[in-house]
Amino acid sequence: MIGYNHSVSLRGASNLVKVLGHERTFLFEGETGIGKSAIFYSLMNYYGDKMGYNIIDCTTLDVGDIQMPRVVEMNGMHVTVFAPNHLLGFQDDKPQLIMFDELGKAPQGTLNGILPILQERRQGMNYLPEGSFVLATTNCASDGLMDTLKAHQRRRTVKVLVRKPHAGIGVDENGKEFVEPDSWMEYALDNDIAPEVIMFVRNHPDCLESYLDGSDSKRIFNPSREPSVDAFVCPFTLEVASDIVKVKQKISEEELTASLCGAIGTLSGVDLMTEVKMGYKLPDWGNLLSNPKTAPIPEDTMVQCMLMTKAIVTTAEDTLTALCQYMMRDKFKDEWEAVFYRSIMSSKKQEIAIDNDTFQKRAMEMNWIFTK
């Protein structure tokens, strides 16, 4: 068992690049599908138009995709120099952010051509613009996916183990649920993941356990099991499942079930369908927002939980008041209302909540104490 000792979260990985990525190349190693590629996109959002951006898929690279030889004359002699691929951004004036995705799967010849970029920000006689960042990702060698680097290649980088995001549902001293920071749940609530998928993870948190920690969950990829076992829930496949669930009205139940089983495995696909069927019990959303004081409230507490989850995901400045008015009614479970308030205040939607009088008044009234 390897374990996740001395590892960082995805957020921690991004911070390492921000602080030292212009001087050193970080090689982020982690299980397949945990979101390593998302490190690049979070950095892109952070730096905006200050940099040029290039993500290179090493699984499809050939030597010619990195550099091509050309003959030039120097001091009366013809010599060979290497011209870099324009996708690497050597020709641009602004600093570049380059990520070599799946570096461990690059062909050896191609990998050798990448090494000067990793260590010296150089390809041939060409140097990246000052202030450029280079990073790379690879899967754990223990995954058995042919991700291996030789010693002379490995030492060109700072290898950092990135841990798999945990499900992220905690329970406080009063027995109340809350969303833990730096978790998959926190990400899901901020990134429009289907409520049914969020509920699935809440009810089956083992789907985001790791074989590196010795988990024997039948829902996750584990290289020690038979290859025929179709268990592969991970952050990436959960996003795929979310996209499938969002079009449930356009496909048959048979098509939906088959697609979900193909995305996350048979066991998890069938269990997710239970949440999908529960989602059909949600009240009409348009009516709820138009008539929050009279729209029907589901009696089933788990349907209320899913409703609360959908409210967190979909809350906007023009709907927050109606959602607060709906959930403060007597028939709505206080526990789910509390989770809604806490989740909004710890999410990207915090700003609209701070400026909403209904939200603030209810928070003070229930002793959740959020103030402007």
Where are these regions (language model features)?
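C-terminal regulatory/interaction module of P-loop NTP-utilizing enzymes
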Residues: 1-98, 103-372
